Swiss-Prot record:
Lineage: Bacteria, Pseudomonadati, Pseudomonadota, Gammaproteobacteria, Legionellales
Domain of life: Bacteria
Family that this chain belongs to: Belongs to the UPF0229 family.
Region (Disordered): 83-107
Organism: Legionella pneumophila (strain Corby)
Gly residues biased stretches: 91-100
The protein's name in its UniProt record: UPF0229 protein LPC_3097
Disulfide bonds: none
InterPro entries tied to this protein: UPF0229, vWFA_dom_sf
């Protein structure tokens, strides 16, 4: 019998190669559409696909066709209305338009619309972050473990005895050991009953059968009801498992020195952190805190796009952060992560208080604190006090970001797996 081996990498989708060629050819137009889509999305919706619209004029390809000039004489077969030399007026046509009213002239064409998959969308969105291909598919994760049942075993502690399986094992053993004697007992009893029905039975045969019956009964009775070899114990193993829930605090400085470019870098960093956490936890909650001289909890829209601004007092955000944790997210039930983005500016007298808040109140409650400073490397007082916090707490990490291309290398450094 013949067999066909298909080594094509299209996974049953015959248009995969054409689709990839299309994405490469119109990459600039698609990336522009992706960037516009990201601006309209929530952080929690960033890992979904997207419907992309490209103007028809942008995907126009040059083609060979007959020119409009010159003199052409044509006689069509079966024509009885025209003869050679007759001039036929070109028919008019309606122009395509985007409005609701029809046009009285010209031609038009609809925009080209197609769906980007989740993988294609993320590939294009994170391309300028210089993500390694393997890391795009699976970010490094810090696993927790849980104990799960993995069948039964013949050894263990009394607390783990599986009574049902042990009794089934004992029943099977008793049946296996007693069955031969029960069979011979039944045969002996039937033979004894047959001999007793005779007029003159042989007394020696009767005595022998009675002794055999007594022997078989004793053998059956000596089979123990349960033995140590019958015992079965529940077997449990430790397997990697995501913790049930986590909360991610996004803290951002919105003072006058944080322009839109810096806020865009911060948003991309927060998106990466959110995607990292969703791979490790079943339930993620987001808390957005923005601050200048004062801090407040806001929704995502206000967090990124509000025009409120002012000076810089970082401690106001840390105080609010601590208050929210104490009120809503007990560390015993939540894995708490904090990501703070700032340009490093802070009122000098406030920085020591920030250090005190972090060291004495906040850091003991957290799973991880990641601080990114978005500016060239001339650091101020906030960076200096944060370095002292980093020396005391290994779960405090801080890095500097100069431009968009630095986001992922910094993220990888902050969240890489720690070797023992």
């Amino acid at each position: 019998m013949s067999q066909l081996i298909d080594r094509r990498q299209n996974a049953g989708k015959k248009s995969t190669v054409n689709r990839q060629r299309f994405l490469r050819r119109y990459k600039s137009q698609i990336k522009k559409a992706v960037s516009e889509a990201v601006g309209k999305r929530s952080i929690t919706e960033i890992d979904q696909g997207e419907q992309i619209t490209i103007p028809a004029k942008d995907i126009y390809e040059p083609q060979f066709h007959r020119g409009h000039g010159g003199h052409i004489e044509r006689v069509l077969p079966g024509n009885d209305n025209f003869i050679a030399g007759d001039r036929i007026k070109r028919p008019g046509g309606g122009a395509g338009g985007a409005g609701g009213n029809a046009s009285d002239s010209g031609e038009g064409e609809d925009n080209f619309v197609f769906e980007l998959s989740r993988e294609e969308f993320l590939e294009l969105y994170f391309e300028d972050l210089e993500l390694p291909d393997l890391v795009k598919k699976e970010l490094a994760r810090i696993s927790t473990y849980k104990t799960v049942r993995a069948g039964v075993t013949t050894s263990g502690i009394p607390n783990n005895i599986n009574v049902l399986r042990s009794m089934k094992q004992a029943t099977g053993r008793r049946v296996a050991l007693a069955s031969p004697y029960k069979k011979r007992l039944k045969e002996a009893e039937e033979e004894l009953e047959r001999l007793k029905q005779l007029t003159n039975p042989d007394k020696i045969d009767l005595l022998k059968l009675e002794r055999d019956i007594e022997f078989f009964k004793k053998k059956i009775q000596t089979v123990p009801f349960i033995d140590t070899i019958d015992l079965r114990y529940n077997h449990r193993v430790r397997v990697p498992s995501p913790s049930t829930q986590a909360v991610m605090f996004c803290v951002m400085d919105v003072s006058g020195s944080m322009d839109e470019a810096k806020k865009d870098i911060a948003k991309r960093f927060f998106i990466l952190l959110y995607m990292f956490l969703t791979k490790n936890y079943e339930k993620i909650e987001l808390v957005f805190i923005r601050h200048h001289t004062s801090a407040k909890e806001v929704n995502e829209e206000e967090f990124f796009y509000s025009r409120e601004t002012g000076g810089t007092v970082v401690s106001s955000a840390l105080e609010l952060l601590n208050t929210i944790i104490e009120a809503r997210y007990p560390p015993q039930a939540w894995n708490i992560y904090v990501a703070q983005a700032s340009d490093g500016d802070n009122w000098n007298a406030d920085s020591p208080y920030c250090q005190e808040l972090l060291q004495e109140k906040i850091m003991p409650l957290l799973q991880y604190f990641a601080y990114i400073e978005i500016m060239p490397r001339h650091h101020q007082s906030l960076w200096e006090v944060y370095q002292q916090v980093k020396e005391r707490y290994p779960n405090f990490a801080m890095e500097n970001i100069d431009n968009v291309a630095d986001i992922y290398p910094v993220f990888r450094e902050l969240f890489k797996r720690k070797t023992v």
